Amino acid sequence: MSLVTQIIVNADDELRYPTIGELQSIQDYLTTGSNRIRIATIIRDKEKEIIQKASKQIFQLHPEYIAPGGNAAGSRKRSLCLRDYGWYLRLITYGVLAGDKDSIETIGIIGVREMYNSLGVPIIGMLDAIQCLKEASLEMLGQDDIRIISPYFDYIIRGMS
């Protein structure tokens, strides 16, 4: 649900008009609309480059993942990791475009920690991978865009912690 929709639903549930603070949140969201679209476009267009940088960084941090017997050993396991990285980048752009974290919660974070645990994927590695994706993504963006996108990466990191 978008920020605007969430504010309207909350106000309607409470049989009231949106508060001054809620209206200000809507105004802030609307004035950053072109930034949000630009961020989503950059992340989409630079996805392969971002994933390449992030994967290089994560495998330098955790070389044991690509060593024989590691969770990303071999081309098949490694490609599954990289697929997940693309999935997280898409989740981030959904949140950025919606202006809230509900889409991330609904689509992706619920149960992800349990799934990784059941598959034997080290959570610390996923947390580090999301941080690496964040750093690689931020290299592509300006300061205004960084302020918009960073909380969505941080939300996923906190949700998986």
From Swiss-Prot:
Originating organism: Pyropia yezoensis
UniProt-annotated location(s): Plastid, Chloroplast thylakoid membrane
Physiological role: Allophycocyanin is a photosynthetic bile pigment-protein complex with maximum absorption at approximately 650 nanometers.
Biological processes annotated in GO: photosynthesis
Keywords associated with the record: Antenna complex, Bile pigment, Chloroplast, Chromophore, Electron transport, Membrane, Methylation, Photosynthesis, Phycobilisome, Plastid, Thylakoid, Transport
N4-methylasparagine carried by residues: N71
UniProt keyword Plastid present: yes
UniProt name for this protein: Allophycocyanin alpha-B chain
Gene of this entry: apcD
Membrane topology: Peripheral membrane protein
Binding site for (2R,3E)-phycocyanobilin: C81
One GO CC term, this protein: chloroplast thylakoid membrane
Pfam families according to UniProt: Phycobilisome
